[in-house]
């Protein structure tokens, strides 16, 4: 309600993004009748150009051999993609451990998100076709490296927020039954 009664009651706003959901206006308190929205879809042919692979055979995160098994799987995947990998991790520890291990095992250039500022790093990866980029949450959205430079995206764990996060708990309590659809 505050956005509707505040800045957007005085000025027109045009929002564009690849990730803004059509339900966003009601989430921020705008009257749905006052909003024009359009979803233009994606130009990417997911059905013919993408493959989802879930390594269900890996040990659970709590099991002792998990890291070794993840590194073995990651090595196979990176070799299959001839480098050209964006590997995303939910912790810095996991990112650095995997990057150290892949640097030792593979001949491909392995960049880490803390090697350079974000845009310089994306440029460096884009300029070297077989390079790999290992990163954390800051790279889960908004990274675009056109062409064949990145052909594989690996995510070590789905980045669900901690269930005991106090801010998220308060938001869930406020929203009620539909909080999973609206927040999580």
Pin down the residues of each PLM region.
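ASCE RecA-like P-loop NTPase motor cores
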Residues: 1-184
């Amino acid at each position: 309600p505050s956005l509707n009664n505040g800045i957007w009651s005085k000025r027109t706003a045009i929002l564009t993004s690849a990730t803004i959901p059509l339900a966003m206006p009601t989430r921020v308190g705008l009257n749905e009748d006052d909003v024009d929205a359009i979803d233009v879809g994606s130009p990417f042919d997911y059905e013919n150009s993408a493959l989802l692979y879930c390594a269900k055979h890996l040990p659970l995160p709590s099991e002792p051999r998990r890291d070794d098994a993840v590194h073995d799987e990651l090595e196979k995947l990176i070799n299959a993609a001839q480098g050209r990998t964006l590997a995303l991790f939910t912790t810095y520890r996991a990112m650095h451990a995997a990057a150290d291990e892949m640097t030792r095992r593979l001949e491909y250039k392995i960049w880490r998100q803390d090697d350079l500022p974000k845009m310089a790093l994306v440029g460096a990866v884009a300029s070297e076709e077989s390079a790999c980029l290992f990163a954390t949450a800051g790279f889960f959205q908004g990274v675009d490296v056109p062409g064949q430079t990145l052909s594989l995206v690996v995510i070590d764990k789905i980045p669900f927020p901690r269930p005991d996060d106090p801010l998220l708990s308060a938001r869930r309590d406020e929203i009620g039954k539909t909080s999973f659809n609206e927040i999580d």
